Amino acid sequence: MHKAPESVLNALVPMVVEQTAKGERSYDIYSRLLKERVIFLVGQVEEHMANLIVAQLLFLESESPDKDIYLYINSPGGSVTAGMAIYDTMQFIKPNVSTVCIGQAASMGAFLLAGGAKGKRHCLPNSRVMIHQPLGGFQGQASDIAIHAQEILGIKNKLNQMLAEHTGQPLEVIERDTDRDNFMSATQAMDYGLVDSLLTSRS
């Protein structure tokens, strides 16, 4: 599939101009929203994206350790290790991280959505959430394949335990429901405990 050059994608990012005492200052829209403590997690969860998200979380903690951070998620999922780097940082930093699903939060995206601060995890009404077990593919000698299979099983068990803690569901329910792709509406995700509320309009 043809991929647009990065310069073209950058040109599509809107710029915001602010008036200050020293004159005009322009920001790309994401930098401007970062000033409001808003972070976007959009697209595939991979190492480069995870590093950027972690850096933004740490920066906002250093700016105001007692103010909430808002993480907007629209992601099909991706790398478990990259996702866990984001998740561990969310739990480690002092500010509460409020998560909001816009569009979709699937696989690792759903895990990060559920990992937000309790009472501060939200879905927009037409968003979709999907949970499942981690995917793995490996080629090589039989002994190496066995090692990787054990690693995937260990990750699966760990993620299921953490998801049970965040949702309040029994572990056996999580194990059953993540055995295959399990799609949920925003309301179903709230009933399941992945999020705490639906956001339909600004209060």
From Swiss-Prot:
It catalyses: Hydrolysis of proteins to small peptides in the presence of ATP and magnesium. alpha-casein is the usual test substrate. In the absence of ATP, only oligopeptides shorter than five residues are hydrolyzed (such as succinyl-Leu-Tyr-|-NHMec, and Leu-Tyr-Leu-|-Tyr-Trp, in which cleavage of the -Tyr-|-Leu- and -Tyr-|-Trp bonds also occurs). Its EC number is 3.4.21.92. Disulfide bonds: none annotated. The keyword Amino-acid biosynthesis does not apply. PROSITE patterns: CLP_PROTEASE_HIS (PS00382), CLP_PROTEASE_SER (PS00381). Its main location: cytoplasm. The keyword Signal does not apply. Keywords: Cytoplasm, Hydrolase, Protease, Serine protease. One of its GO terms (cellular component) is endopeptidase Clp complex. The active site is at S107, H132. GO terms for biological process: protein quality control for misfolded or incompletely synthesized proteins. GO terms for molecular function: ATP-dependent peptidase activity; ATPase binding; serine-type endopeptidase activity. It is found in: Cytoplasm. Belongs to the peptidase S14 family. Cleaves peptides in various proteins in a process that requires ATP hydrolysis. Has a chymotrypsin-like activity. Plays a major role in the degradation of misfolded proteins. Fourteen ClpP subunits assemble into 2 heptameric rings which stack back to back to give a disk-like structure with a central cavity, resembling the structure of eukaryotic proteasomes. NCBIfam families: clpP, PRK00277.1, PRK12553.1. This is ATP-dependent Clp protease proteolytic subunit. It comes from Shewanella denitrificans (strain OS217 / ATCC BAA-1090 / DSM 15013).
